[in-house]
Curated annotation (Swiss-Prot):
This is U-actitoxin-Avd3i. Belongs to the venom Kunitz-type family. Sea anemone type 2 potassium channel toxin subfamily. Residues 1-16 form the signal peptide. It comes from the Eukaryota. Disulfide bonds join 21-71, 30-54, 46-67. Serine protease inhibitor that inhibits both tissue and plasma kallikreins. Has hemolytic activity. Inhibits voltage-gated potassium channels (Kv). The record marks 31-32 as: Reactive bond for trypsin.
Length: 82
């Protein structure tokens, strides 16, 4: 069991970004107007969008911090590595 857990953790790190983060932004057909964040694979950043409230996908986060954590994006405020 521990071996499997280690394997999946290494595999996740090795292959980079969570697959859900590669999904396109989906606003959805409803009109609720929730502020959400998604990972933009072109800019390699989490960005704000307005979510309609239904028929979205997993690339839809309540906070910028949650998006950055799940998608492996460093915060804009963290110091750059040399």
């Amino acid at each position: 069991m521990v071996f499997l857990l280690c394997f999946f953790l290494v595999a996740d790190v090795s292959y980079g970004i969570n697959g859900d983060c590669e999904l396109p932004k989906v606003v959805g057909p409803c009109r609720a107007g929730f502020r959400r964040y998604y990972y933009n694979s072109s800019s390699k950043r989490c960005e704000k969008f307005i979510y309609g409230g239904c028929r979205g996908n997993a690339n839809n986060f309540h906070t910028l911090e949650e998006c950055e954590k799940v998608c492996g994006v460093r915060s804009r405020d963290s110091p750059k590595e040399n």
